[in-house]
Amino acid sequence: MKIGVIAIQGAVSEHIDALRRALKERGMSAEVVAVKHKGVIPECGGIVIPGGESTTLCRLLAREGIAEEIKDASARGVPILGTCAGLIVLSKEGDEQVEKTSQELLGIMDTKVNRNAFGRQRDSFEAELEVEILDSPFTGVFIRAPGIVSCGPEVRVLSRLDDLIIAAEQGNVLALAFHPELTEDLRIHQYFLDKIFKNA
């Protein structure tokens, strides 16, 4: 089985490394691949959309033909993890900033996002988070992070910070405003792997 990490921009190598370590710890076997072009996603049993700059990410996903492949994979129930800008890309609706830049969001999650909910790049910070799927706090690394301001009834809220939703799940899709790949804590990647292998 392949797990594809969208490798257009963002913390790509960190996600690949975290997934490989999580696979090893779980005693699972899968090939983690960097996805740069159309044609790889249909072979993947799991997809990661890393952080980066959401406007550029949306444009490149559409241009490379990867956006439609991700939508098709999601419709088939393939587990998808989006972190930071990945959370924005997965959403159905953005704020005025997103509308202004004409970003073509994937619309896979029934969520509305505030693109820079936690400020600009200089406003990076860490916070101890209670995340519903974990049995103890998780250190969230936030870098110019977005936040979910509202969501539909099918969305399960997993964590909040400052009245904003920062982790949510809708069926096969998991979206985080923070960067689990920038910590040594593999629990979220392991949770995602469990979703992938249950779906396989």
UniProtKB/Swiss-Prot annotation:
Pathway the protein acts in: Cofactor biosynthesis; pyridoxal 5'-phosphate biosynthesis
GO MF, any single term: pyridoxal 5'-phosphate synthase (glutamine hydrolysing) activity
Residues that span the membrane, as ranges: none
Pfam families in UniProt: SNO (PF01174)
Chain positions recorded as L-glutamine binding sites: G52, E53, S54, R115, I143, R144
Keywords: Glutamine amidotransferase, Hydrolase, Lyase, Pyridoxal phosphate
Active-site residues, as the UniProt record annotates them: C84, H179, E181
SUPFAM superfamilies: Class I glutamine amidotransferase-like
InterPro entries listed in its UniProt record: Class_I_gatase-like, PdxT/SNO, PdxT/SNO_CS
GO BP terms in the entry: glutamine catabolic process; pyridoxal phosphate biosynthetic process; pyridoxine metabolic process
Hydrolase found in the keyword field: yes
Any one Gene Ontology cellular component term annotated for this protein: glutaminase complex
Enzyme Commission code(s) on record: 4.3.3.6, 3.5.1.2
Entry-linked HAMAP family: PdxT
Function text: Catalyzes the hydrolysis of glutamine to glutamate and ammonia as part of the biosynthesis of pyridoxal 5'-phosphate. The resulting ammonia molecule is channeled to the active site of PdxS.
Binding partners and assembly: In the presence of PdxS, forms a dodecamer of heterodimers. Only shows activity in the heterodimer.
NCBIfam families: PLP_synth_Pdx2
UniProt-recorded name of the protein: Pyridoxal 5'-phosphate synthase subunit PdxT
Species name: Methanosarcina barkeri (strain Fusaro / DSM 804)
